[in-house]
Each structure stands twice: as C-alpha cells, then as structure tokens.
From Swiss-Prot:
Cofactor, free-text remark: Binds 1 zinc ion per subunit.
Protein name: Adenosine deaminase
Catalysis: reaction(s): adenosine + H2O + H(+) = inosine + NH4(+); 2'-deoxyadenosine + H2O + H(+) = 2'-deoxyinosine + NH4(+)
Protein family: Belongs to the metallo-dependent hydrolases superfamily. Adenosine and AMP deaminases family. Adenosine deaminase subfamily.
Binding positions (substrate): 14, 16, 170, 279
Native source organism of the sequence: Serratia proteamaculans (strain 568)
Keyword vocabulary terms for this entry: Hydrolase, Metal-binding, Nucleotide metabolism, Zinc
Cofactor(s) listed in the protein's UniProt record: Zn(2+)
A single GO cellular-component term on record: cytosol
Nucleotidyltransferase among keywords: no
Taxonomy, superkingdom: Bacteria
GO molecular function: 2'-deoxyadenosine deaminase activity; adenosine deaminase activity; zinc ion binding
C-alpha cells in the first residue's frame, strides 16, 4: 500500500532508462535510424524486459535503443521533459532522476556538456509546468572507463547548479570503484552529494569501498550487504541508505525471486532502505507496482512498506527544511 498522507518518492530512477517506446519510434523516424521494428508493439520486446535477463550487463543492453535515437540535443531535452511527465503521472511528489551524459551523447557524438545542459533545461521546464520537485543525479558510466568518466564529471561540474549528486553505475565487476577515487574527490570538493551503485553485481567489499573510499552517503541496490553482518551493522549505525529496486533485481538475476530479496532484512535490521523503480520504461513497471505488488511479495508488512516510504524522503538529497515543506504540502 501507499500511504497518501506521506510524500511518495523515487530516488533511484534512471532518466536514460525511462525513454518511452513511442519516443524511441518517433525519434528513430525523425533521424532516419534503423530500428529493430517500425511499429510500437513490435518494437516493445526490443526495448522492454519481457523475462529475467541472465546478468546485469544483459539487462543494461535493453537500454541501448533508447539512447541510440538521441540524434541531437533537443531530443535529449524532450526525453528529460517526458521523464518529469512520467514521474508526475506516476503520482510522485519528489523524484531524483539520474543520467549518464556520456552514454546519452555517445551514439551521435553529441557534446557531453551540451547533453547535461539540455537535460537540466528539460527537467526545469517539466518541474515548472507540472509542479513536481525533481532533482538530477549525474552518473559516471564506469563501463566506458576512467577517461570517459572524467568527461562526464567535467560536463556535470560545468553545470553544477543543476546537479545535486554524483553516482557511479555500469559494469561493477569489470570497473571497481577504486579506479575513480580522484573523480569522487573532485565531486565532493565541488559540494556534490554521493550515491554509488554497489553490491549489485559485486559483493559486500564493493559497498565498503563505495563508503570508505568514494564517500557514498547512499548505496544503489546494495543487495549483497546481507552477506556481511558487520556491514549491516555499519549501515544501520551510520544511517547510510539503501536504494532498493525490487523488480529490477529480479530482472537482472541479482536476486532469484522477490521472496529472497533482502529489503525486509534491511528494514528489520534498522537499515534505512527505500522502494524505487530503477528503469521504469525498460522494466515495464511503475512505482505503484513496486509498492502494491513487489513489496508484499518480498515479504514486507504494511508497516514496513510505510517505513520504506518514509525512508524515501529521509534519504532524499534535500535539506531538512525542504523535506518538511514537502511533508506539509502532501498533508495539505
């Protein structure tokens, strides 16, 4: 259930993993690009998960068609604006949308800084038009290596006023966090908040590294934390939040079934964990599904689901005053 008296948040939601199938079709036609299908329903299986993928990298390949059609900066702006529309239509009061500017720029060799600017512009326009508070998290896509991540970081820092936090995502096994120490030092010096994808494909040591070496205040996914009792204690004691994405973890085969998902264990151990989507368009789900279907199947009680909803706002990269304003607004 969703408690209508509390703000509904989604703080782990990839903008470039939430490109509508219709938009992929539209932009493919606009830029005369060869798509795997030229009708919406025929295209859908190519851009949306229809069954669990064998691993994270296979899952991520489903995202590639969405960014393949970003033929100019206006297309990036359109996708950003539509992401705000989707968040508002999902009933969210607050969302943190994350994006990898290098990934979005790569196919058509767009300027990384230009992509950042276009996304910020689309988000600001959407927030203004739709009355929803949306913040941006810049991603460094570790899969493309240290130099590409440096390009991303510099593009994000060039528009620091529009970016709230920095993340590291992609191939966690092939590109461990230790490769990016200098990147995160610069980000923290610039005042960016820090969240890191960790403990999704790699083990608890990846989470420890994200916290101790990269300065992570929150962990994306973090499912492997349950394998390390000392880490579970540390997360609970220091208020380091886990951004749980239930359906996503099944679709990437990170977790075998919802019944085995560690979210309930996190909450019962006092770890601050929240419920989020990840890549809604690619997954074919929305936040309501995660609360009404996935969370109960993961063994959460109604009280635990409510706690997870509260945690979403507690974990948000907002000031305490901004959080209280949002609570007051929802209470009406």
């Amino acid at each position: 259930m969703i408690d209508s008296r509390l703000p509904l948040t989604d703080i782990h939601r990839h903008l470039d993993g939430n490109i509508r199938a219709q938009t992929i079709l539209d932009l493919g036609r606009q830029f005369n690009l060869a798509l795997p299908a030229d009708e919406l329903e025929a295209l859908r299986p190519h851009v949306q998960i229809t069954h669990a993928e064998p691993d994270l990298v296979s899952f991520l390949q489903k995202l590639d068609w969405g960014v393949a059609v970003l033929g100019d900066l206006e297309a990036c702006r359109r996708v950003a604006y539509e992401n705000v529309e989707d968040a508002a239509n999902a009933g969210l009061h607050y969302a943190e949308l994350r994006f990898s500017p290098y990934y979005m720029a790569m196919k058509h060799q767009l300027p990384v800084t230009g992509v950042v600017e276009a996304v910020i512009d689309g988000i600001r326009s959407g927030s203004r038009d739709l009355g929803i508070d949306v913040r941006l998290i810049g991603i460094m896509s570790r899969t493309f290596g240290e130099a590409a991540c440096l390009q991303e970081l510099e593009g994000l820092l060039a528009h620091r006023d529009g970016i709230t936090a920095l993340d590291l995502a992609g191939d966690e096994l092939g590109f461990p966090g230790g490769l990016f120490l200098n990147h995160f030092n610069r980000a923290r010096d610039a005042g960016l908040r820090i969240t890191v994808h960790a403990g999704e494909a790699a083990g608890p040591e990846s989470i420890w590294q994200a916290i101790r070496e990269l300065g992570a205040e929150r962990i994306g996914h973090g499912v492997k934390a349950v394998e390390d009792p000392a880490l579970m204690d540390f997360l609970a004691e220091h208020g380091i939040g886990i951004e749980s994405c239930l359906t996503s973890n099944i679709q990437t085969s990170t977790v075998a079934s919802l019944a085995q998902h560690p979210l309930a264990k996190f909450l019962r151990h006092g770890v601050m964990a929240s419920i989020n989507t990840d890549d809604p368009a690619v997954q074919g789900i929305e936040i309501e599904h995660e609360y009404l279907v996935a969370a109960p199947q993961a063994g959460l009680t109604p009280a635990e689901i409510r706690t997870a909803q509260e945690n979403g706002l507690k974990m948000a990269f907002l000031s305490e005053q901004e959080k209280q304003t949002l609570r007051d607004k929802v209470r009406g």
